[in-house]
């Protein structure tokens, strides 16, 4: 595995790989890698001749009161995870390398961002789309891999890749969970012991909702209230949102039918966790 820290060197390598016809699997991350990221890397390894991993904590996607400075970082750990999962190139640029001058152009996402995390974090997805446009141009991937824990992000990325005719296939990968159901996340380290015991109820509430939908419930409001009540009963967290939309359009629905997403965000004392399930409403 080779570690690359400059845009120029990374572009030179991927241009040569692209010219030789080799397939490139790309996994963009903000580091502090866990089993969820490892799953993305293994899938990329299975499906491509070359695997490129990026580790970059992107300041553009953090708001003024968010956890940019507190976001966990451990490049030694990330290097080990990368090596163990078959990464060929680890792209690890600095903020100054990625943004050497004041940004004069950003990618403004106008659909799929006014709900869920997009509603709570204005400007977040513009930051995500902007850095991905740069990373796609730098790494020239055949396929790019994203976890469905950030399902809204996947929907936004699929939309902007289509809109800009970017020649990359977006590969969504199922959420990886702890044994008790908690979605793996770099931010889980901020949970207190008590909160860690409560946190699996996020997924538990989604499972209860799924059972009700499969039993025939078609009223979104009833399902959302069921989720909120479960979380409020079994955790001390505050429900940021518990919403149900068509997926991937993220349009509001009056009746549960077709492919839908049920997504939640819960604020604990020092961390905000998200989770979701997608399913087909009959």
Swiss-Prot record:
The active site is at residue 37. ATP binds at residues 30-37, 147-150, 176, 184-187. GO terms for biological process: pantothenate biosynthetic process. The keyword Ligase applies. Pathway: Cofactor biosynthesis; (R)-pantothenate biosynthesis; (R)-pantothenate from (R)-pantoate and beta-alanine: step 1/1. It is found in: Cytoplasm. One of its GO terms (cellular component) is cytosol. Its EC number is 6.3.2.1. One of its GO terms (molecular function) is pantoate-beta-alanine ligase activity. Its main location: cytoplasm. Pfam families: Pantoate_ligase. It is an enzyme of class 6 (ligase). (R)-pantoate binds at residues 61, 153. SUPFAM superfamilies: Nucleotidylyl transferase (SSF52374). Gene3D superfamilies: HUPs (3.40.50.620), Pantoate-beta-alanine ligase, C-terminal domain (3.30.1300.10). Beta-alanine binds at residue 61. The reaction proceeds by a bi uni uni bi ping pong mechanism. Catalyzes the condensation of pantoate with beta-alanine in an ATP-dependent reaction via a pantoyl-adenylate intermediate. HAMAP family: PanC. Belongs to the pantothenate synthetase family. This is Pantothenate synthetase. The lineage of its organism: Bacteria, Bacillati, Bacillota, Bacilli, Bacillales. The gene is panC.
